[in-house]
A protein has these predicted regions:
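Phosphate-binding loop of NTP-binding sites
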Residues: 1-139, 145-156, 203
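A general beta-strand register signal
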Residues: 178-180
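A short glycine-threonine-serine/GTX helix/turn-capping micro-motif
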Residues: 91, 189-195
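Short beta-strand segments
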Residues: 22, 185-189
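Short, polar loop motifs at secondary-structure junctions
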Residues: 141-145, 163-164, 312-315
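ATP-dependent carboxylate-amine ligase
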Residues: 46-50, 55-69, 99-100, 125, ...
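Short acidic loop-to-helix transition motifs that present clustered carboxylates
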Residues: 29-33, 144-145, 166, 228, ...
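Active-site-proximal beta-strand elements of phosphoester/diester hydrolases
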Residues: 76-78, 189, 247-253
């Protein structure tokens, strides 16, 4: 549900830094590459259809090299459970037939097509059934929902991460930590990212890379030069003030859990004392527009000193949903009103985090311009 783009980008960079030149398709732009997709290096070698050729295909035969095929050495794809098309309501990821599948976390989302969490868990079960016996499933040991999925059936090697009893664990702070593989030191990550969520993303990527042949120590070392993904706490600009610069960030968070994780990560990175955190968010996804998770918004915004919600296009009352936050929350019916509210409240040293899964009406640039005026 969360961390798909970042974890996919981490894994892709690990493979790239270790000479594999992978192909990839990512739902964001990894800063290390500057593009969201490429084919990767083609390699000719022995027939790689170890689990049998894809449906509708037959393994090549005939000629002087009857088992030679041309294939991508490694291809990393970001996959999710959203439906394939209006005429195919199966989740997109059941079509991919992965050799290595990373299950990072799972909670209810996409209320426009799923009735409940159990319906999503069934789709994840279908995904696991497509992984061959020679494949690997990498799963977050902290997620009860994923445990339920695994108990429905597992026919491949399993590697877990995150929990104290998992195969891959971390010791240390999210920005600098040791990686343990079954309790033994396996590498160290020191990087510019923050947040426990990114620490978990790193463990998932390291466990997946190991299945492709990259040693955990080499994978951890590669993450030191990982530059994150655009729109993941991306600094869009700063405005200088005598009392401290105001920083404006852009983040893709739109689910309550993602909002909370993003703000908690920033709070942890800033430490204490720190400038205030101002959360500016747009409930734009289909799930949020339906109001399915509106009651979770005050919880998701606990780390914010002030919160500003864009209520345009909503069928529910954002003011009522945010009432438990009292004076800490304001609601703007349009972008102009929202910008005015944020600028009026902003102080030197503030950190303004803009969160939406869309363009948010160019609010980042408009805030920077208004703050500098």
């Amino acid at each position: 549900t969360h961390g798909k783009t970042t974890t996919t980008a981490m894994l892709t960079w690990i493979l790239e830094a270790n000479g594999l030149q992978p192909g990839f398709l990512i739902g964001g732009v990894p800063m290390n590459f500057g593009i969201s997709a490429r084919l990767g290096t083609l390699a000719t070698g022995e027939n790689r259809f170890a689990a049998g050729p894809p449906q509708g295909k037959t393994a090549p035969s005939g000629g002087s090299e009857p088992h030679a095929v041309e294939s991508v050495g490694a291809f990393v794809i970001e996959a999710d459970e959203y439906d394939t098309a209006f005429f195919d309501k199966r989740s997109k990821f059941v079509h991919y037939r992965p050799r290595t599948a990373v299950l990072n976390n799972l909670e209810f989302d996409h209320a426009d097509i799923f009735d409940d969490l159990a319906a999503i868990e069934r789709q994840f079960h279908h995904l696991i059934r497509t992984v061959p016996p020679s494949g690997r499933v990498v799963s977050n040991g902290l997620e009860e929902s994923l445990d339920r999925v695994l108990h429905q059936g597992l026919w491949s090697e399993l590697r877990t991460f995150g929990a104290a009893v998992s195969d891959f664990t971390a010791v240390g702070e999210p920005h600098a930590f040791d990686v343990l593989n079954q309790g033994r030191p396996a590498g160290r990550v020191e990087w510019a990212l923050s947040g426990v969520h990114n620490q978990l993303n790193a463990l998932a990527a390291i466990a997946a890379a190991e299945h492709v042949g990259v040693a955990p120590a080499d994978a951890a070392r590669a993450l030191a030069s990982f530059e994150n993904v655009r729109r993941r706490m991306e600094v869009r600009g700063t405005v200088a003030h005598a009392g401290g610069a105001i920083t404006v960030y852009d983040d893709f968070a739109h689910h309550p859990t993602a909002i909370r994780t993003t703000l908690d990560g920033l709070q942890r990175r800033l430490g204490s004392p720190r400038g205030r955190i101002l959360a500016v968010f747009e409930p734009r996804s289909n799930t949020m527009k339906l109001g399915t998770m509106k009651s979770q918004l005050p919880w998701s915004l606990e780390a914010a000193d002030l919160a500003f919600c864009h209520s345009g296009g909503l069928d529910w009352d954002a003011t009522e949903a945010l009432a438990p936050m009292g004076a800490r929350a304001q609601v703007g019916k349009n972008i102009d009103e929202l910008v005015t509210q944020v600028v009026s409240a902003a102080q030197p040293g503030d950190h303004i985090v803009c969160m939406s899964n869309g363009g948010f009406g160019g609010v980042h640039e408009r805030l920077l311009k208004a703050l500098a005026a």
